[in-house]
Amino acid sequence: MSLFKYLRIKIFYTLMRPFSTLVRGARIRLFIKIMRPVHGTKILDLGGQPTIWDFVDIPLVITCVNLPGIAMIDHQTHHDITYVEGDACHLPNFKFGDFDIVFSNSVIEHVGNSGKQMQFAHEVMRLSNNYWIQTPCKEFPIEAHSGMPFWWYYPSWMRTYFLSQWSKKLPGWTEMVATTTVIQKRDLKTMLPNAQILTEWFIFPKSLIAYSVGNSPQGSERQPYKINAYR
């Protein structure tokens, strides 16, 4: 990979940081509005980092599940966070009722092929009636991982060419991009049939959010918000 291409990636992530912070903050505010966590709500965060919970003032009890060496365990926070190493597609040590809400932000597209994604979804539904699963939209002009415009619309040979060039300089990063499997709205609905599907907009469709509101952390019945999108 040329120095220019390497710098392009570094610059992309640097420029995206404030934008990502803005979008995640808005997304978490929507999460609070819809899911209504209270002080001490028990949340299972699949594949997440503690930094996203900095947007939430309410002290929560959070379990973050990640592959070994991924979680930022030294992050200082006002939440009660436990870090667990594990596979989000197979969590035999957890059972229904252990958590009030299952949460995941931009993870399901990284777990593997459609079969692995279905396993992920089954674990979500097995563990709670209340969940919030977000994944990027194919239609957003700038792909969130590679920084390439309209990445998912390139012919496969073109994506393969770019990946082969990138892998010479950044093999780990390239593997992450190469193994990302974008999810369409209809597929997300198939995986999580009881969910409401929310489209997050930033001029273009930015991401999809599948959420279900079954029982509140206090145990009372709640009805889901009738929201199709926010801008």
List where the protein language model places each region:
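Short alpha-helix
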Residues: T174-Q196
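Class I SAM-dependent methyltransferase Rossmann-like catalytic core
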Residues: M1-R36
